Regions:
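Alpha-helix/helix-capping structural signal
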Residues: 52-53, 121-122, 145-148, 174, ...
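A short LG(V/I)-centered, amphipathic sequence patch enriched
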Residues: 1-12
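Hydrophobic hinge/microswitch elements
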Residues: 162-205
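Central regulatory/effector-binding core of bacterial HTH transcription factors
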Residues: 43-103
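Acidic, Gly/Pro-rich loop/turn segments at junctions of secondary structure
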Residues: 76-169
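Hydrophobic residues within well-ordered alpha-helices
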Residues: 13-16, 86, 135, 178-183, ...
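Alpha-helical linker/hinge and terminal dimerization helices associated
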Residues: 19-40
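Immediate post-signal peptide segment of exported/extracytoplasmic ligand-binding proteins
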Residues: 39-46, 134-136
Length: 205
């Protein structure tokens, strides 16, 4: 088992500590750690928690390939923005989006991201967008869940004169991405979350 109960509450067992240290990198690295746990404790159930947009847009498209590598493993994926406590919530892996400021946890980076503007070719048709400054004349879509918003991003690029309200504001990245796919404006999003839409030619950076 991964956790054991003591007078101080739930604590990691030796196997649990080994598992957490092994979990790093992308899905193949998660898979290596999972395989080790299965061999050590014959566990056939992997419980994963992640943020909703990351779970839907990045993790889910890769789960089938992961399952093919470990066909006997049952996978449970729970998505929320809540802070997970491993002992309380019965979670094996928590995939978080942030700046690694979790001092009580063993944290490994799965993948670094880039935050870029994305839009559909339909929206860009007939619009002359050649520079960052040209974005000021466009419909910018805001997502509450991104670590970097339009205001900060434009300031970092030393773009001045931006003082407009967003026509569309969403609290989930997958909603912002879908709005951009529908030609409703330009989003500022993670290349990881928008990657599938780009590969399918629904969006372009």
């Amino acid at each position: 088992k991964i956790f054991s109960r003591s007078s101080k509450g739930m604590v990691l067992t030796t196997i649990g500590e080994k598992y957490l240290k092994e979990v790093s990198g992308a899905l193949n690295i998660i898979g290596q750690a999972t395989n080790q746990v299965i061999n050590d404790i014959h566990q056939d159930y992997l419980r994963i928690h992640s943020a909703p947009s990351f779970g839907l847009l990045w993790l889910m498209p890769r789960l089938d390939k992961f399952r093919q590598a470990w066909p006997e493993l049952k996978i449970s994926l729970t998505c929320s923005y809540e802070s997970i406590q491993f002992s309380r919530d019965n979670i094996d892996i928590d995939i978080r989006h942030g700046l690694s400021q979790w001092p009580t946890l063993v944290v490994k980076t799965i993948k670094n991201e880039r935050v870029l503007p994305f839009s559909s070719s339909t929206y860009l048709a007939g619009r002359d967008v050649q520079s960052i400054e040209d974005l000021l004349a466009c419909d910018l879509i805001h997502s509450d869940s991104t670590l970097i918003g339009w205001s900060n991003w434009l300031s970092w690029h030393k773009v001045r004169g931006w003082n407009k309200n967003f026509i569309f504001n969403f609290d989930r990245s997958y909603m912002s991405i879908e709005a951009a796919r529908m030609g409703m404006g330009i989003i500022l999003e993670s290349n990881l979350l928008a990657g599938q839409s780009v590969s399918q030619r629904h969006l372009e950076p």
